[in-house]
Design a protein with these regions (language model features):
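Glycine-rich beta-alpha loop segments
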Residues: 19-154, 331-335, 358, 363
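Charged/polar low-complexity intrinsically disordered segments, enriched in acidic residues
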Residues: 34-42, 288-301
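Acidic/glycine-enriched connector segments
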Residues: 112-114, 135-196
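Short, acidic/small-residue loops that bind anionic groups at enzyme active sites
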Residues: 125, 149-160, 195-196, 209-236, ...
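Short acidic-hydrophobic, aromatic-tinged amphipathic segments that line or gate anion-handling sites
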Residues: 172-180, 257-267
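Active-site/ligand-binding-proximal alpha/beta "capping" segment
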Residues: 175-225
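Conserved thiamine diphosphate
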Residues: 183-194, 243-262
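N-terminal accessory interaction module
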Residues: 289-295, 302-363
C-alpha cells in the first residue's frame, strides 16, 4: 500500500505525508512544497501522477526551456485537460470516429453514405466523433444528430467553418495541435471509419494503422468506406500491396487490421461484428487478458493454441476468472476471459484471433 489511508487531504501548513515518487524536481525542499500542494487537491490514488505533472513543469522552468517550447507544452496540456473533461461523462458510451474530406459537398453520394452510417450507429446507441467541420465531418454529425456527436475541431487558416449541427454544443472542442486532436480521436473511439479525403485523411489512416500494428492503440475495427463504384480505397489498397507489402515493409497479416467496403451494411457489420463476442483487453502482470461474452469450449481453446502459437511467448492460452487486479478495479468482472503470455509483437495476428473469437472468417 503506497498511500496513507488516515486522510486524503492536507491542510495548508501541514507537513506532507505522501511518499514521493522517484521522479522529482531535483530540489528536496521544493519537492516537499510540491507534495504539500498536491496533497491539498489530489486524491491519494493519483497523488503521485499529479506530483510528477507539477515536477515536469518546474523542471522545464529550471531547464530554462525556450518560451516557444513552454507554449507548446502549456497549450497541449490545456487542450488535453479540457477534452478529458468533455468526454468523461460519456466514457461508458461506445463511439465511432469518422474521418474524411472537409470538401465533400452535401449532394455528393459520399455525404449521403456518411449520414446513413452515422444514423445506423446512433440507432444502436453509439455516438460519433468527427472533426466538427464541413464535408464528411458535418455529414457524420447530421446523421447521428448533435446529441450523439462530438466535434474535435482543429484551428486552421482555411476550412475553419464549424458544422451548423454542432456549433455552440458543449461537445465541440477546438484544438491548436493536430497531435493532441488525434490523441483524443483514437483514445476515445471504439471503431473507425475512413471515407475518401486528402492528405489529412490519409495521415489519419496511416497513423491509426501504425498504432494498431504496434500495439499503441487498443484493437478496434477499421473500415475504409467508399460508395459503390468508387475506386479511392481500391487504388490505395493496390498501392499498399505493391509498394509496401511486396517489398516487405508491412506484413500480409496487416490486411486484417482493416476492411474495405462500399456499403453502409458492410461497415455496420464490421463494427458490430468486432464486438459481437469480444469486449476488451488488459495486461495484468505479463498476461494479456481478453474479455468476452463467451469463451470457446476446450476444443476451441486447443484450436486457438495451435493456430496462434506464434504469438504466445510461453505457456498457453487458457480460460481464467477475473484477476485480482480486475476485481479490485471492478473492471468488467462479469465477463468471460482468456489469458496468455502475448509476445507483444504480433498485433495483426492478435486481431485475427479476435476474429476467431467472434466466429468470423478472415476477409
Amino acid at each position: 500500500r503506497r498511500w496513507p489511508r488516515s486522510r486524503s487531504r492536507c491542510s495548508p501548513g501541514d507537513p506532507p505525508t505522501m511518499k514521493l515518487p522517484r521522479y522529482r524536481t531535483g530540489d528536496p525542499a521544493l519537492d516537499d512544497e510540491v507534495a504539500a500542494l498536491v496533497e491539498r487537491v489530489a486524491t491519494p490514488t493519483d497523488a503521485d501522477l499529479v506530483f510528477e505533472l507539477v515536477a515536469s513543469s518546474l523542471r522545464l522552468a529550471r531547464d530554462r526551456a525556450d518560451r516557444g517550447d513552454l507554449k507548446i507544452a502549456n497549450a497541449a496540456l490545456k487542450e488535453m485537460r479540457h477534452a478529458f473533461g468533455v468526454f468523461a461523462p460519456y466514457r461508458a458510451a461506445r463511439k465511432v470516429a469518422i474521418f474524411g474530406s472537409a470538401r465533400t459537398q452535401p449532394d455528393d453520394p459520399l455525404y449521403l453514405q456518411t449520414t446513413e452510417l452515422a444514423a445506423a450507429v446512433a440507432a444502436r446507441d453509439w455516438m460519433v466523433v468527427t472533426g466538427g467541420g464541413p464535408g464528411i465531418m458535418e455529414a457524420g454529425i447530421e446523421g447521428a444528430g448533435p446529441d450523439n456527436a462530438f466535434g474535435v475541431s482543429i484551428q486552421l487558416p482555411f476550412e475553419t467553418a464549424t458544422s451548423q449541427f454542432i456549433a455552440g454544443d458543449p461537445k465541440l472542442m477546438n484544438f491548436r495541435y493536430f497531435f493532441t486532436r488525434k490523441l483524443e480521436f483514437i483514445k476515445e473511439s471504439d471503431a473507425f471509419v475512413l471515407l475518401p479525403g486528402g492528405y489529412g485523411t490519409l495521415d489519419e489512416a496511416f497513423e491509426l494503422l501504425t498504432l494498431l500494428q504496434t500495439g499503441k492503440a487498443q484493437p478496434a475495427p477499421v473500415v475504409l468506406l467508399d460508395v459503390p463504384g468508387g475506386t479511392y480505397w481500391e487504388h490505395w489498397g493496390a498501392f499498399v500491396d505493391r509498394e509496401l507489402e511486396l517489398p516487405g515493409y508491412v506484413s500480409p497479416e496487416d490486411h486484417h487490421l482493416m476492411r474495405v467496403t462500399d456499403t453502409v451494411d458492410g461497415a455496420v457489420d464490421e463494427i458490430f461484428g468486432f464486438y459481437s463476442n469480444y469486449h476488451s483487453q488488459r495486461f495484468v502482470e505479463g498476461w494479456l487478458v481478453l474479455r468476452m461474452q463467451q469463451t470457446p469450449d476446450a476444443a476451441g481453446v486447443a484450436a486457438l493454441n495451435e493456430e496462434f502459437a506464434d504469438i504466445v511467448a510461453r505457456d498457453a492460452i487458457e480460460v481464467i476468472d477475473a484477476t485480482p487486479a480486475e476485481v479490485a478495479d471492478d473492471d468488467h468482472v462479469e465477463l468471460a476471459r482468456l489469458a496468455f503470455r502475448f509476445d507483444r509483437h504480433g498485433w495483426s495476428r492478435l486481431r485475427m484471433m479476435i476474429n476467431r473469437l467472434n466466429g468470423r472468417s478472415e476477409q
